[in-house]
Amino acid sequence: MAGRTVTRADLCEAVYQQVGLSRTESAQLVEMVLKEIADCLARGETVKLSSFGSFVVREKGERVGRNPKTGEEVPIEPRRVMVFKPSSILKHRINGTVGDGLDED
């Protein structure tokens, strides 16, 4: 069952409620963190957030695909993709199980 979607505004409100910064400062903080993560990923760097997970940029090489309607072979250009690998702590939290408290990442 899918839960609700958490937006930037929700994150800003949570920072405002829990940290005690003003709403403007909370929004700026959230934006700065997201921008830094995006900038690191754009440079091809891995972003590891302890007890949460890692965002990794992977290179996919050129390959041959196939048009499903015609069966014609079509080249697929090389590209970079972003992958999120959750930490074992986050996996245990999502599944409601108790982990050993150690992060595999």
From Swiss-Prot:
Coiled coil: none annotated. GO terms for biological process: DNA recombination; positive regulation of metabolic process; regulation of DNA-templated transcription; regulation of translation. GO terms for cellular component: cytosol. It comes from the Bacteria. Keywords: DNA recombination, DNA-binding, Transcription, Transcription regulation, Translation regulation. One of its GO terms (molecular function) is structural constituent of chromatin. InterPro entries: Hist_DNA-bd, Histone-like_DNA-bd_CS, IHF-like_DNA-bd_dom_sf, IHF_alpha. HAMAP family: IHF_alpha (MF_00380). Belongs to the bacterial histone-like protein family. This protein is one of the two subunits of integration host factor, a specific DNA-binding protein that functions in genetic recombination as well as in transcriptional and translational control. Heterodimer of an alpha and a beta chain. This is Integration host factor subunit alpha. It comes from Xanthobacter autotrophicus (strain ATCC BAA-1158 / Py2). The gene is ihfA.
